[in-house]
Amino acid sequence: MAKKGKKYQEAASKVDRTQYYSVEEAIKLAKETSVANFDASVEVAFRLGIDTRKNDQQIRGAVVLPHGTGKSQRVLVFAKGDKITEAEEAGADYVGEADYVQKIQQGWFDFDVVVATPDMMGEVGKLGRVLGPKGLMPNPKTGTVTMDVKKAVEEIKAGKVEYRAEKAGIVHASIGKVSFDEEKLVDNFRTLQDVLAKAKPASAKGTYFKSVAVTTTMGPGVKVDTSSFKL
């Protein structure tokens, strides 16, 4: 494993790896120890007490963060008829039908989120092997398969983020940029925390919020004290 640079080592020395910080302290420290020479993303990782091998303990969804993520999302919408105009007026970057299916099959990926109306899923389904591994396949659980394309596009543009528990029960998400005020990052953190708390499967036993960490792109991780987290 490659040794971290001097700048990282200096930043990491400011974080007590044996200590668990309050959400406010963790975010403040993560901002202070950002080593990137650009406006880095502030990321969170929630390790949940779930068994993702069980169908009733799958956690997946989407949430609109009150202050957005600071990242501009390019939205592709698959729709027909009036829904094309609706998507365009809502601010979608690309809107079309089978023409975009062919374009993607040829290697085009200049988009970040895909939305589709239910009547287009027959066509979009052809892209499962391409979009699936990239986490771009539209899904009703995240609100990206819907007839209300206006709402879907507007929410994505406003800062909607998708979340999904990985095999180890870890949910990764971006809650903003280092340039954000600490208060805004805390608001975004709490919004995601509340959504995950409400998503706790009834069959999940034991401690739910096992561990939480805040970090920035290329920065050191800061452990969060979860003892006050409510379900």
Swiss-Prot record:
Q: Pfam family of this protein, just one?
A: Ribosomal_L1
Instruction: Give the keywords, sorted.
Output: Repressor, Ribonucleoprotein, Ribosomal protein, RNA-binding, rRNA-binding, Translation regulation, tRNA-binding
Give a GO molecular function annotation for the protein. rRNA binding
Query: Would you name any one GO CC term?
Result: large ribosomal subunit
The record ties this protein, via InterPro entries, to: Ribosom_uL1_bac-type (IPR005878), Ribosomal_uL1 (IPR002143), Ribosomal_uL1-like (IPR023674), Ribosomal_uL1/biogenesis (IPR028364), Ribosomal_uL1_3-a/b-sand (IPR016095), Ribosomal_uL1_CS (IPR023673)
Provide the GO biological process annotations: regulation of translation; translation
Coiled-coil ranges (or none): none
This protein's source sits in the domain of life called Bacteria
Q: Which CDD domains match?
A: Ribosomal_L1
Quote the function comment for this protein.
Binds directly to 23S rRNA. The L1 stalk is quite mobile in the ribosome, and is involved in E site tRNA release.
Q: Which family does it belong to?
A: Belongs to the universal ribosomal protein uL1 family.
Q: How does it assemble?
A: Part of the 50S ribosomal subunit.
What's the protein called, per UniProt? Large ribosomal subunit protein uL1
